[in-house]
């Protein structure tokens, strides 16, 4: 079964958690976009929800599918955030940020009563780190920050991190996030202690946020061959 089909199964299963009257955090990325299309169909059938988008792209896809949006600063409560992930381990720790939306995704996830993560089975890992860890940094002094990120990762137990500035598709200009920052992609191979990496990176002034999501996801829905497997903490 293709990854697309598995993502669709996971997104469809996530709809079971949605009820009328909810304000939803709307994640970013390919699986989140599938969810938005399915959510739009439910809204046409009478489901009454509104969403807080975590990226300009998500806002665009939501609007195209008839999902009502509300400004994040006009929200009192976010019931559920529904998002994808680049990696998920057995403790529901995540790596996110392949789509460069990690800061806003984390803000919304932290503000939500529940975070649901939808993935295809290829995203399940025993140990985080095969997927490069994105670190969002201020553009001012980013080269200095990159050096500090490298040293922090080594102190946190990453043997040979490779820290690279993410660039646009042309490979020339640096990619700029919706918030106006740069992304450092940190190839780690394995992250034995996500908490240590979290603490080390947060101590660097130039680091805005990083793609480790710890103690946030409480439901992981995995699209597998012919079905969706729901795991809850």
From Swiss-Prot:
The gene from which this protein is expressed is rpiA
The organism's lineage? Bacteria, Pseudomonadati, Pseudomonadota, Alphaproteobacteria, Maricaulales
Q: Which family does it belong to?
A: Belongs to the ribose 5-phosphate isomerase family.
| Catalytic residue positions | 105 (proton acceptor)
EC class: isomerase
Question: Which organism is the protein's source?
Answer: Maricaulis maris (strain MCS10) (Caulobacter maris)
UniProt function note: Catalyzes the reversible conversion of ribose-5-phosphate to ribulose 5-phosphate.
UniProt name for this protein: Ribose-5-phosphate isomerase A
Arranged from A to Z, the UniProt key words for this protein are: Isomerase
Q: Which GO terms describe its biological process?
A: pentose-phosphate shunt, non-oxidative branch
Q: Where does substrate bind?
A: 28-31, 83-86, 96-99, 123
């Amino acid at each position: 079964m293709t990854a697309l089909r598995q993502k669709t199964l996971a997104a469809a299963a996530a709809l079971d958690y949605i009820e009328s009257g909810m304000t939803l955090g709307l994640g970013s990325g390919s699986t989140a976009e599938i969810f938005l299309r399915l959510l739009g169909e439910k809204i046409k059938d009478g489901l009454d929800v509104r969403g807080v988008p975590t990226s300009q792209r998500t806002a665009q896809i939501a609007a195209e599918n008839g999902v009502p949006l509300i400004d994040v600063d006009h929200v009192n409560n976010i019931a559920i955030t529904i998002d994808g992930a680049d990696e998920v381990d057995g403790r529901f720790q995540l790596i996110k940020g392949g789509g460069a939306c990690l800061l806003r995704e984390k803000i919304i996830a932290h503000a939500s009563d529940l975070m649901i993560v939808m993935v295809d089975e290829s995203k399940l890992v025993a140990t985080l780190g095969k997927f490069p860890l994105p670190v969002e940094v201020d553009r001012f002094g980013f080269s200095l920050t990159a050096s500090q990120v490298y040293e922090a990762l080594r102190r946190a137990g990453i043997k040979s991190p490779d820290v690279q500035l993410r660039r646009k598709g042309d490979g020339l200009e640096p990619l700029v996030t919706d918030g106006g920052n740069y992304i450092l992609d940190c190839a780690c191979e394995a992250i034995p202690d996500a908490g240590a990496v979290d603490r080390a990176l947060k101590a660097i002034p130039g680091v805005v946020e990083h793609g480790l999501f710890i103690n946030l996801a409480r439901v992981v829905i995995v699209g597998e061959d012919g079905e969706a497997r729901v795991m809850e903490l």
